[in-house]
């Protein structure tokens, strides 16, 4: 398999997940977008980041977008190349808007665009690779499919599925973005291991 294009660009939305009772399953795409472009090269990989995360995110092979691109190319047996990547980030990092899922989906989608074959790396494969890297599909699915999604993942078989829902017209999300960062792992660690039956029922 070869790469058909040497310059591609994608944009991926922010997402909000863990909606209502849908912990690790329900997510919503938002009208806030990261844009990423890639030139395939024979040289070393370089990453330029503008906006959110500039000066803080990795700028070489350890960059999350690059890692997702590499994994996707490996998965379909496509050749690895050097990349010159430019990221315009508008999604705040570590503030609950799915920045890591958006970066992963951007990387896999860039791989698909470089390959240039509509039959390779379809949306289901993007969902699978993204969920594998992210650990759960709740932010990945709305970043891939748009709208609202209900998703699930079998941890034993790694099978991933998602159903897309169209939100009612006239509903506009409002995001309250804190002025501090909180990593997902730390936020999850603050949650109790179990929830009382009454609380779970009330949340539904």
What are these regions (language model features)?
Residues 62-69, 104, 173, 184:
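A general structural signal for well-ordered alpha-helical segments in protein cores
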Residues 119-204:
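ATP-dependent small-molecule kinase catalytic core of the GHMP/sugar-kinase superfamily
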Residues 64-71, 106-114, 125, 129-132:
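Generic beta-strand or strand-like secondary-structure segments
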Residues 1-95, 113-119:
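ATP-binding N-lobe of GHMP and related small-molecule kinases
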Residues 90, 94-102, 138:
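Gly/Ser-rich catalytic serine loop of serine hydrolases
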Residues 46-49, 97, 184-189:
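Short, charged, solvent-exposed linker or helix-capping segments at domain edges/interfaces
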Residues 32, 97-120, 143-149:
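DPxDG-like acidic metal-binding loop motif
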